[in-house]
A protein has these predicted regions:
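Methionine residue identity
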Residues: 1-5, 27
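DPxDG-like acidic metal-binding loop motif
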Residues: 108, 137-165, 179
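Short hydrophobic alpha-helical segments enriched in small aliphatic residues
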Residues: 13-16
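Helix-rich "cap/lid" substructures immediately adjacent to catalytic or cofactor-binding pockets
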Residues: 103-133
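N-terminal, positively charged, Ser/Thr/Ala/Gly-biased leader segments
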Residues: 29-91
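Glycine-rich, flexible beta-strand/loop modules in the N-terminal catalytic cores of phosphate-handling
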Residues: 74, 79-115
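ATP-dependent small-molecule kinase catalytic core of the GHMP/sugar-kinase superfamily
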Residues: 41-46, 52-56, 60-70, 159-206
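Phosphate-handling active-site elements
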Residues: 117-128, 152-170
């Protein structure tokens, strides 16, 4: 199986907008037609939780990270995210959980800013985050939320990034985010950013 090698360091570049779009994970899209441009009105996504089916810590690196080998699996528990465009150049976050930050300390904010800065997006986005995945439970809630926002921002502003390109960028947010973009079943190595997709497992209760 071909491994997806994701580098932590990458160069930012400006890419022109394109009609190509990445749709994985999108539940519902509302659009309005204005002249020849299609503008996204609202995008709703599911941010799937994940569990580790096995974990082997192989060594501690000089940068403080641990090298690992583990099987990661998406499960049918998810947060709900709604993205709405804003005319003003800002990122606005709201959530149903009072103790979560709604500024740049939230991973969904960081995810949106990552792409919007790189592609010099001049408008804004509102992120409505409905949390159902337990926080700080090792189920990848924050990472999955960030991954879903990357997918949504890519679609909303028609940035044309492929899944691999989203995964390459997402490692700058967190080691688990690339898997949350990929989803499914995968062998994770390195600090979790080197992913080998595996065959889907039979459905079961966790």
């Amino acid at each position: 199986m071909q491994k997806m090698m994701l580098r932590i360091k990458f160069r930012y570049a400006f890419y022109g907008k394109t009609e190509h779009s990445f749709e994985s994970g999108i539940m519902k899209i509302k659009v309005i037609q204005r002249d020849t441009e299609v503008q996204m009105k609202e995008i709703k996504l599911k941010a799937m939780a994940k569990i580790n089916l096995g974990l082997d810590v192989t060594r501690k690196r000089e940068d403080g990270y641990h090298e690992v080998r583990m099987i990661m699996q998406s499960i049918n528990m998810y947060d709900q995210i709604r993205l709405s465009p804003l005319e003003e150049p800002q990122i606005r976050v709201k959530t149903n959980v009072s103790f979560l930050p709604v500024n740049e300390d939230n991973l969904v904010y960081k995810a949106a800013k990552l792409l919007m800065d790189e592609f010099q997006v001049t408008s804004g986005v509102e992120i409505d985050l409905r949390k159902f995945i337990p926080t700080a439970a090792g189920m990848g809630g924050g990472s999955s939320d960030a991954a879903a926002v990357l997918v949504g921002v890519n679609r909303m502003f028609q940035l044309g990034l492929t899944k691999r390109e989203l995964m390459e960028r997402s490692v700058a947010i967190g080691a688990d985010v690339p898997f949350c973009v990929l989803r499914g079943t995968a062998l994770a190595e390195g600090i979790g950013e080197i992913l080998t997709p595996l065959p889907s497992l039979p459905k079961c209760f966790v």
